[in-house]
Each structure stands twice: as structure tokens, then as C-alpha cells.
Amino acid sequence: MGKKGVYAGVKADFRYGDESVTRLINTIMSDGKKSVAAKIVYEAMDIIDAKVEDADALEVFRKALGNVAPLVEVRSKRVGGATYQIPMEVKPSRREALAFRWIKQFATRRGGRGMAEKLAAELLDAANEQGASVKKRDEVHRMADANKAFAHFRF
């Protein structure tokens, strides 16, 4: 009989009341420094608010997240000596996790002053269907499309 509790999930952040923002903060966080990660994310949101007049930062953030999250991905499966790349549908939780990971990865690589500015620029580009994170999503979709022939190999 297990004594583990039920996973409570993430709490909504205090500024926007949104769980997705908390997940982004957790993704940005390194070495357990959550307050630093929160400061970076909120600063990026403030930059977005200043740059975009017609929409608030949370709308831009949600649009960016939707544009980066992949619908399908390829997974490797070994069938008789050959390894096939099989296109699979992505679960919603993994979609969001991949989107956050890619946004962080490409924001870090960007040129700019600080991480907050880089993150704001990447989110704005993603919301406008541009930027490296959206290209990554398109690349993953192209890979899945190219390997449609192996879709009958299911896990």
C-alpha cells in the first residue's frame, strides 16, 4: 500500500492567476532560484505590455504558446532490425512542456541585453508566427509528415 499523496499540480501565479505562467517560471528556473525566474518572466511580460498596445501580455503569451506547441512528433521504434520514425499525436501536457522548453532554449540563444528582453522578444515573435521556436515546431511537423507511411506502427 503506497503512502504517496496525490499530485497537487502547480498553483496559479500570484500576478496573472494563470497556471501556464507558473509552468513557464518553473521551466525558466535554474538551481532552484524561483524568485529570480519569476522576476525574469514578469519583467518580460512588462516589456510585452509596453510594446503591444492592442493586447495584454497574457493574451500574447497564450497566443505564443499556441503557435509553438506541436500537434504531432516522431518517436523511434525498432521493428526487426530497422528503426522507424513513427509520427505520434502529442498529449496536451507534453505539448505545453515542449513549447516552454523550446521558448526557453531559443530565448537563451538570442542576442540581447538580459534574459527578460530575450524572452519577451521570443514570445512576441512566437505570437506573430515567427522566431526560432516556431521554426522548430514546423520542423517537427515536417518530420512527422515525411514519415506518415510508418503511422501504422503504433506503440
From Swiss-Prot:
Origin: domain of life: Bacteria
Cellular-component GO terms for this entry: small ribosomal subunit
Signal peptide stretch: none
Key words of the record: Ribonucleoprotein, Ribosomal protein, RNA-binding, rRNA-binding, tRNA-binding
Gene3D superfamilies in the cross-refs: Ribosomal protein S7 domain (1.10.455.10)
Single GO term (MF): rRNA binding
GO terms (BP aspect): translation
Pfam families, per the entry: Ribosomal_S7
Transmembrane segments: none
UniProt subunit comment: Part of the 30S ribosomal subunit. Contacts proteins S9 and S11.
Described purpose of this protein according to its UniProt entry: One of the primary rRNA binding proteins, it binds directly to 16S rRNA where it nucleates assembly of the head domain of the 30S subunit. Is located at the subunit interface close to the decoding center, probably blocks exit of the E-site tRNA.
Family as reported in the entry's similarity comment: Belongs to the universal ribosomal protein uS7 family.
Designated name of the protein: Small ribosomal subunit protein uS7
